[in-house]
Amino acid sequence: MSMQDPIADMLTRIRNGQAANKAAVTMPSSKLKVAIANVLKEEGFIEDFKVEGDTKPELELTLKYFQGKAVVESIQRVSRPGLRIYKGKDELPKVMAGLGIAVVSTSKGVMTDRAARQAGLGGEIICYVA
């Protein structure tokens, strides 16, 4: 069976892994998933990530906890295959009044809403993380 929305699957694996207090979660890898994982690591939502395997690469995310609680309180898919959501540089949303991030796919790569605003770029809103 083919997967319809691999990014939603990635976010669900992170959500479920933290709900079950797992140390790490693995999933099939792609360039977009690695780019999203890189943003999550830079923003401190996950500990680390690595890609293993040549023929079927697997992405392993090491989840992050603070005082026994998951760092990621909520992670929500916004733009999906059936309904893409694009925003211009002036329309980029602030998640939880700036406490969370929106992961945005721009022409210059995947970045946070803050970085996209500073670069003067809009793009596809992939997900909200808080």
From Swiss-Prot:
**Gene3D superfamilies documented for this protein:** 3.30.1370.30, 3.30.1490.10
Tell me a GO cellular component.
ribosome
Enumerate the UniProt keywords alphabetically: Ribonucleoprotein, Ribosomal protein, RNA-binding, rRNA-binding
GO BP: any one term: translation
Q: Name one GO molecular function term.
A: structural constituent of ribosome
> What InterPro entries does UniProt report for this protein, alphabetically?
Ribosomal_uS8, Ribosomal_uS8_CS, Ribosomal_uS8_sf
- What NCBIfam families does the annotation carry? PRK00136.1
Its assembly, as annotated, is: Part of the 30S ribosomal subunit. Contacts proteins S5 and S12.
Q: Which family does it belong to?
A: Belongs to the universal ribosomal protein uS8 family.
Q: What does this protein do?
A: One of the primary rRNA binding proteins, it binds directly to 16S rRNA central domain where it helps coordinate assembly of the platform of the 30S subunit.
Q: Know the name of this protein?
A: Small ribosomal subunit protein uS8
